[in-house]
Amino acid sequence: MSKKVKAAVLTAPGQIDIQYFPYPKLEPGGGMIIRSLQSGICGTDKHSFKGESKQNTGTDSAFEAAYPFIQGHEAVGIIEEIAPGCFSHDYNGEPLKVGDRITFCPDVVCGDCYWCRHSSWYPWCDSKERECYGNSLSIHTPPSLFGAFAEYMYLLPKTYVYKVPDALSTDMATLTELMCVTYTLDKAKELFAFDGEGFAFGGTVVIQGCGPLGLAHVIKARMMGAGTIIVTDISDYKLNLAKAFGADIVLNSLKTTAEERISLVKQASHGLGANVVCECAGVPAVVPEGIEMLAKCGVFLECGHFCDVGGIELNMHKICAKNVRILGMNNHACTGYRPTMEMMLRHEKDFPWDKFISHKFSLDDYEEAIRTSMGPESMKVVVVANEK
C-alpha cells in the first residue's frame, strides 16, 4: 500500500478539511520532496482564509487563490528525495543532499520573461507559468502537495531553495521569509541624503501595526541603527512585545486619537516628524495618518497590502507638500535569504527571539491555529507538521 500524506486543506474561505494524498513519485527532472518540519501562518494565509484572495491586481501576474489548496509557505523542511537531474545546489551554490534542512522562496518564476531577465533578484515574473506555493496551486494539480501545512511537500524544479545553517534553530529559520520582506527599509536607506531625505542612522521610524510583519520591521529598524522607533497597534499584547524587541514608544490606537498620535510623533522627533513610516497593519484607513506623521522628504513604506482589500481617498497635495516618497512592497528579494539567516544568527542574543513565535499547533488543529493567528494575543503562529 502506498504511503499517504496528511494535509490541512483550505477547501473554501473559512473551511478547513484534513485530507490524505498519495506520496509523490519523482520522475527524472521532477523536482524535490521535503519532509515539512514547520511553517508560519502568514498574513496572506489569513486573507485567503477570509476569502480575500486577489493578489498582484492590475499586473499581468494577477491571480486569485486556487481553492481548494494547501496553505503554508514560511516553511522549513528536510530534503527527503531529489529527482535525478535536479537541485544539485541551492540558490547560493551550496551543494544539496538528502537530509539537508532547507527553506525556499514561495514564488516559482519562469526565468525567461522580461522581468525575470531584468530583475532576477526579485520575483517579478509576469509569465502564466509563475506559481506561488500555498496560494496559486490547487490540490487538483498533481501531486497536490504544494503547501507546507502537510507532512510532505513537493517543490517544483525551478524553486529557489536555501540551505539552513546548522547553527540556526528551526524556529528562527521559520522567520526567514518574513524577515526578508523588511528589505524596503534597506531601500529607504538608499534614499538618504544630507538634505534630509530618506532614513539614516539615528532616524525616527514609525511602524503602523505590530503583527509579525510589524515586529519584523521593529527588529530590522533597530539593527539598522534607527533612533526612536514608534509603534502603533490596537493590541496591548503586541505593543508590549514591540517594546521587548526594541521599540521606544508604543501607542494603542484604541486609546489615542489620530491627532494625538501625530502630535506624539512630532514631539519624539524634535518637531520634525518621522523619517520613515512603515504601514504593516494591512488596513487602508491608516495610510493618511501615516503620511501626516512624516517629516519633509520622509519615506512611506507600504508593506501591509499583499492582498487587494480595497482603497481609500488620499489628498495628493499632502504628498507634494512634503516631497514624500512612497515605496510599495509586493514581495521580497530572492537574494535576501542567506543574508537574513546570517543576520539573525549574528543577532541571536540581541533580541528575545523565543517570544516571536507565540503559539504552535499540529496539522490536526490547523483551523484553531489560523483563528488564533487572527486574534489580539498572538504573534507568529506556527504549524508543526513533523517534529524532526
Map each language-model feature to its residues.
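Glycine-rich beta-strand-centered segment in the early N-terminal region that forms part
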Residues: 24-39, 54-117, 146, 165-167
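Short SAM/SAH-binding signature in class I
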Residues: 272-278, 298
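Glycine-rich phosphate-binding loop and adjacent beta-alpha segment
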Residues: 243, 248, 284-348, 385-388
